Each structure stands twice: as C-alpha cells, then as structure tokens.
C-alpha cells in the first residue's frame, strides 16, 4: 500500500535586502525593522539568527537588511557608527534605533511595543516636528 506524500509548507518571511533604491518604499507602511550589518562584523553574525527568527515568526512585519559596505550612503544617512544597528519604523515614521546585538526577548518586546502604539498621536507629533525642522 502506498501512502500519499504530505508536504509541510512552512510560512517563512525572508528578510529583504534594503538598498537606497528600495528604501523609501520599504519603510512606508506597517512595521519595518532594519538591520544594518556587514559581513566582517562578528556581532552582526551573532544577531542574524535572532533577526531571521523574528522574521519567520512575524510574517506581517517587513524585516530588511542593509549591508553597510554596499550601502554606505544609506548607512551614513542614518548616522550608523556601530553595527549591528537595529532601526524600527511604523507607518513610515522612524521610532527606534539602537546599536548592538539584541537578544531575541528584546526584539520581541520591541515588536510588542510597536504594535501597541497609538499612531494617531505619534503621526501628529511627527508632522509637527517635521514642520518645525523645515521652518514652517
């Protein structure tokens, strides 16, 4: 007797390579986490499985990786001086930036905080700060 083959499909959300060409579109909507890294960076390699694990667990979030060697101008625009650096957006608004390899629990806590935010208040404050910076 032959049994039907069953295949298990795992819903994996791969990380996205972020470049200066796709950056603005990538951070525009929803929750986005950006990992600034370099291949020569030991702590970056230690953080990579944490970041990848979170991307597999939270398929509704965009997880982007910015290679600081290939995207030096993009890294400079964020003022990245130490890697890895994790940057978080929600609805196109940058809300968090921290250098260092975070443990999985800290990444999960950050995601929970990002999900819980009242974006109406934050959007209003962000627009106010942008207007002040532009001298309006």
Where do the protein language model's features map onto the residues?
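CheY-like receiver
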Residues: 119-136
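Short cysteine clusters
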Residues: 41-44
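N-terminal "domain-start" segment that seeds a small globular fold
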Residues: 6-25, 60-62
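Structural micro-motif
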Residues: 32, 72, 78-87
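Short active-site neighborhood of thiol/selenol oxidoreductases, capturing the structured segment around
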Residues: 28-39
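Non-catalytic, surface beta->alpha helical segment in thiol-disulfide oxidoreductase systems
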Residues: 87-121
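Conserved helix-turn-beta segment immediately C-terminal to the redox Cys motif
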Residues: 31-33, 46-66, 72
């Amino acid at each position: 007797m032959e049994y039907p083959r069953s295949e298990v499909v795992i819903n994996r959300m791969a990380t996205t390579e972020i470049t200066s060409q796709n950056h603005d579109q990538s951070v525009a909507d929803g929750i986005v986490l950006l990992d600034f890294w370099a291949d020569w960076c030991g702590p970056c390699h230690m953080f990579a499985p944490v970041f990848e694990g979170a991307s597999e667990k939270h398929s509704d979030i965009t997880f982007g990786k910015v290679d600081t060697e290939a995207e030096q101008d993009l890294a400079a625009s964020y003022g990245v001086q130490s890697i890895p650096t994790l940057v978080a957006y929600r609805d196109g608004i940058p809300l968090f930036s921290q250098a260092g390899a975070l443990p999985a629990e800290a990444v999960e806590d950050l995601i929970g905080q990002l999900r819980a935010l009242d974006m109406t208040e934050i959007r209003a404050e962000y627009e106010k700060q942008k207007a002040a910076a532009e001298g309006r």
